[in-house]
Amino acid sequence: MATVCVVGSGILGLAVASCLLEKTNVNIVIISDDFPHESSHDLKYSPFFTSPWAGAHFRPFPSVTEFDQRHVEYTRATYGHFKKLAAFEPQEETSIRFLEGTDLVERGHPNFEYYSELKQGYREEIEDFVVNDWEHGFSASYKTWVLNAPFFLSYLFKKLRSNPRVTLKQGKLNTLREAFTENAAKNDQSPDLGANGYNYVFNCTGLGLQMNGGWDPACYVIRGQTLLLKVPSGPHLQKTVTHQSKEGQWTFFIPRPLSNPESPTEDYVILGGTKQEKDFDSGSPRSQDSLDILTRADRLFPELKDAKTGHFQVIQPNVGFRPSRKGGVRVEREKVPDVENSFAYHCYGAGGMGYELSFGVAFAVVDLFLDDYNQ
């Protein structure tokens, strides 16, 4: 039985490993500098391990760019997979919840016409899609999903860790080549890769670790800052809303299931956010960013404020560096030129859409592997 290697344990790495378990009989080694924990409460905060701090919801989008259509296909596949998980797995384990999503796009927004004219990719395969009246522009609602990112990572991680076909190796690779051959240069943090390395390696490293080191030059970070809020009970806990201003600014809130330790039925809410491209300056929250988010929310979502104090109850701010890529997520097979019968399967650069794309890109990249493995 072959052994394959998955490099990276964010949402894409765990989704790929989960798909490999489901669709193949191979053994799997997962190499990562950071791993989730079996308990979501044990996660240590790091802006560079972005997956635990995501808002994690799905919103459809019209096909504006060439790579949007690929993303549409991946998001629909993920949507279908999450529907199955919600139907057959306990919510207290996956945290997945289906509810109403709403888009609000102001007139004058750069992509207003793509939404208002319902361009390709927006409403296809979306349940309960309805166009609403809204005096300031375009509005639509639809059935969507939300989840608690730390819970869901822990759910996947526990299933992988308990499977005898899966081995976890904590360490850091300087080059992707290290995973293929014992002769590659190692560093002090390199994990033990065995005698010969691996012939099949899935590159789920966010910014795209390259064969000879460094990152994919098409990749860049988007600094995202959000706020975790305690909010009053009400119908707002049964929906997620995304507002896009005419200036192109995004403001959203997303219920985070099972997040309130005081009440399993009253969720905290993720309020966001910032999209600061190529901003690697600070992994710490910025007070001005928090103030800007709260100022917009005060106008757009006053129902989230505490009724007694008239203020937002901020539990904590979160910062994550979303690994993005020009041209969209990379889902591609690469023959390693100087290592016999060896292939890299690239799966990285999802930006702020890691959860939305997760199982769609995972199934796609595993299919690429099966084309080689079954020959």
From Swiss-Prot:
Its cofactor is FAD. The keyword Flavoprotein applies. It comes from the Eukaryota. One of its GO terms (biological process) is nitrogen utilization. Its EC number is 1.4.3.1. FAD binds at residues 9, 12, 34, 51, 55, 322, 354-355. Residues 1-17 form the signal peptide. Disruption phenotype: Unable to utilize D-aspartate as a source of nitrogen. Keywords: FAD, Flavoprotein, Glycoprotein, Oxidoreductase, Signal. InterPro entries: DAO, FAD-dep_OxRdtase. Pfam families: DAO (PF01266). Glycans are attached at residue 203. One of its GO terms (molecular function) is FAD binding. GO terms for cellular component: peroxisomal matrix. Gene3D superfamilies: D-Amino Acid Oxidase, subunit A, domain 2 (3.30.9.10), NAD(P)-binding Rossmann-like Domain (3.40.50.720). It catalyses: D-aspartate + O2 + H2O = oxaloacetate + H2O2 + NH4(+); D-glutamate + O2 + H2O = H2O2 + 2-oxoglutarate + NH4(+). Selectively catalyzes the oxidative deamination of acidic amino acids. Protects the organism from the toxicity of D-amino acids. Enables the organism to utilize D-amino acids as a source of nutrients. Enables the organism to utilize D-aspartate as a nitrogen source. PANTHER family: D-AMINO ACID OXIDASE, FAD DEPENDENT OXIDOREDUCTASE SUPERFAMILY (AFU_ORTHOLOGUE AFUA_5G13940). Belongs to the DAMOX/DASOX family. This is D-aspartate oxidase. The gene is DDO.
